């Protein structure tokens, strides 16, 4: 399975000089020019930050932006010494998950969908926002509304994609809130795996043991986990299917 699901203008290629202050990366373009790009991924990016690695960036010359360049992808070598392009722009994850929902690629997990809303307040105090709130079609046997939380996943060990790659209090809170929605609603954790070499998904216990424990508790309570795999190219992203849990 390798379905092209999102197209975009060809990205600009270069080489990573360094990433610093979490939000910034200096990149040398093929012309020799060095530019500073915005890095939307503020995490440690385990296994990705190799200086001299090939990268791809986008260009948006809006006067409202401080930096016209955004770091989108990096090329790494996996355990088989194969080149793998990894999507590192965390802001792109929701766009990908929304696209596969709209294309009915998750129908086996969530059924047919009537409406999709983004950033809907939820939880006891309504101070949290769920990435996607879905209502099912009237023909669905399960009439429950669906709450989907999206997590961008770039870390891999051998062929297992892992999340998180560091301690995430926010992620822990999201799992507890998803668990509280069950059984009145469907709670879904959608992992956006932004590299083609993952065959399985598991929680990143080594990075955040509490997250792993909460993940398994939520799973036992009825949370649905959907590890969504994608392959990144210079001008598009392809769908590689749903991966099993390890």
Curated annotation (Swiss-Prot):
Q: What is this protein called?
A: Sugar fermentation stimulation protein homolog
NCBIfam families according to UniProt: sfsA (TIGR00230)
> Gene3D superfamilies annotated for this entry?
2.40.50.580, 3.40.1350.60
The record's annotation in HAMAP family points to: SfsA
Family statement drawn from the similarity comment of this UniProt entry: Belongs to the SfsA family.
InterPro entries attached here?
SfsA, SfsA_C, SfsA_N
Highest taxon of the source?
Answer: Bacteria
Which GO MF terms are attached to this record? DNA binding
Membrane-spanning parts: none
């Amino acid at each position: 399975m390798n379905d092209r699901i999102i197209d975009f203008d060809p990205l600009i290629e270069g080489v990573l000089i360094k990433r610093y202050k979490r939000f910034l990366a200096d990149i040398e373009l093929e012309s020799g020019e060095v530019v500073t790009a915005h890095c939307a991924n503020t995490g440690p990016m385990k296994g990705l930050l190799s200086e001299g690695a090939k990268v791809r960036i986008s260009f948006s010359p809006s006067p409202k932006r401080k930096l016209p360049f955004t770091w989108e992808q990096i090329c790494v070598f996996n355990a088989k010494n194969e080149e793998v392009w990894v999507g590192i722009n965390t802001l792109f994850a929701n766009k990908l998950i929304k696209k596969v929902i709209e294309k009915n690629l998750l129908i086996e997990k969530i059924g047919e969908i009537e409406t999709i809303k983004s950033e809907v307040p939820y939880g006891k105090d309504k101070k949290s926002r769920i990435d996607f709130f879905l209502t099912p079609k009237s023909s669905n046997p399960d009439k429950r509304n669906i709450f989907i939380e999206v997590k961008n996943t770039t870390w891999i060990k051998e062929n297992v994609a892992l999340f998180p790659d560091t301690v995430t209090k926010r992620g822990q809170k999201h799992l507890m809130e998803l668990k509280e929605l069950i059984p009145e609603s469907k709670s879904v954790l959608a992992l956006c795996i932004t590299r083609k070499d993952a065959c399985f998904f598991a929680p990143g216990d080594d990075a955040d043991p509490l997250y792993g424990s909460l993940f398994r508790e939520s799973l036992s309570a009825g949370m649905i986990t959907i590890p969504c795999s994608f392959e990144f190219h210079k001008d598009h992203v392809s769908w590689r299917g749903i991966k099993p849990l390890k």
